[in-house]
Amino acid sequence: MARVGPGRAGVSCQGRGRGRGGSGQRRPPTWEISDSDAEDSAGSEAAARARDPAGERRAAAEALRLLRPEQVLKRLAVCVDTAILEDAGADVLMEALEALGCECRIEPQRPARSLRWTRASPDPCPRSLPPEVWAAGEQELLLLLEPEEFLQGVATLTQISGPTHWVPWISPETTARPHLAVIGLDAYLWSRQHVSRGTQQPESPKVAGAEVAVSWPEVEEALVLLQLWANLDVLLVASWQELSRHVCAVTKALAQYPLKQYRESQAFSFCTAGRWAAGEPVARDGAGLQAAWRRQIRQFSRVSPAVADAVVTAFPSPRLLQQALEACSTERERMGLLADLPVPPSEGGRPRRVGPDLSRRICLFLTTANPDLLLDLGS
């Protein structure tokens, strides 16, 4: 009798007719390969990884190494518009980006005087990482505005009577997520205030007319309108040094984005490796259930091992505690059931109790039917 080995699930056996020795004899069978054999090669790689857990761990470690912010920062590029370099303070920004360690590209941008961030995925990209980790997502754009240019847009914006998504400085065709930055607006408004009092002559009648019509209350109103209507952030900085710190902070945040995306894509991103993730072993005879119950109590915030031991000693299982809660006649009695349980004091310490806060949280945990209920009022 012929044996069909592993991977021959789609193999069929057929005879070729009658044998030489007569109609009762059968010739050796022939094998015909079905379409399912083509799937063997596709699944062989996954099977090889399953048989080699060490190789799978190495691949996961390499993928996590590529997700480290310092590694992502090397593949991050800040595209700076050429018009920004015409400003005398642009050297401060360029030196800060160079010290950060990311790539800096000087190339024309639209709109002018803007910065963009681009991130390149590693080549080759590890297969163990979800594709959304390296998705480019929404591109960030930071537009630098001169104070007078910003104030002219504010004067236009404050004349609009209703909600609008239109922004004076940014084209509607822009696909990136825009942010605005204005350098020296406070000092500029202060100087314009002295100009209006006649202390010095304005440089341009057009600019002076625009500036006299806009005051700080109108600027603050425009900032609120931009945030509520257009979801647009406006950064007001006093110097190029402050702007450089902000640009570096945004660059570092974008370098941390892939690792955060990877952690959020995991089933339980809050679990860490080691004993905590492994849990408590529970045997078929019930050995270990009390330790698992003690660990569950420890998962509540601000619960020490001594407090957890006090609860588990009084109620060795959650079912016993639930029955005790159901036996309470009033809600107040139910909430304070565990409050007066004594906690063994440490060396030289004073006697303690479980307290009403933890008693209330454990009671709600075992009795509520609302999955969105916030147990910890202090969080």
Swiss-Prot record:
Span list, region Nuclease-like domain: 50-266
Region (Disordered): 1-55
Top-rank taxon, per record: Eukaryota
Keyword DNA damage appears in the UniProt entry: yes
Assigned GO CC terms: endodeoxyribonuclease complex; Holliday junction resolvase complex; nuclear chromosome; nuclear replication fork
Main location: nucleus
Result for mutant: R353E: Decreased cleavage of 3 prime flaps, nHJs and 5 prime flaps
InterPro entries reported for this sequence: EME1/EME2_C, ERCC4_domain, Mms4/EME1/EME2, XPF_nuclease_EME2
Location in or out of the cell: Nucleus
Subunit structure: Part of the heterodimeric MUS81-EME2 complex; the complex forms specifically during the DNA replication phase of the cell cycle.
General function of this protein: Non-catalytic subunit of the structure-specific, heterodimeric DNA endonuclease MUS81-EME2 which is involved in the maintenance of genome stability. In the complex, EME2 is required for DNA cleavage, participating in DNA recognition and bending. MUS81-EME2 cleaves 3'-flaps and nicked Holliday junctions, and exhibit limited endonuclease activity with 5' flaps and nicked double-stranded DNAs. MUS81-EME2 which is active during the replication of DNA is more specifically involved in replication fork processing.
PANTHER family reported for this sequence: CROSSOVER JUNCTION ENDONUCLEASE EME2-RELATED, EME1 PROTEIN
Name under which the protein is recorded: Structure-specific endonuclease subunit EME2
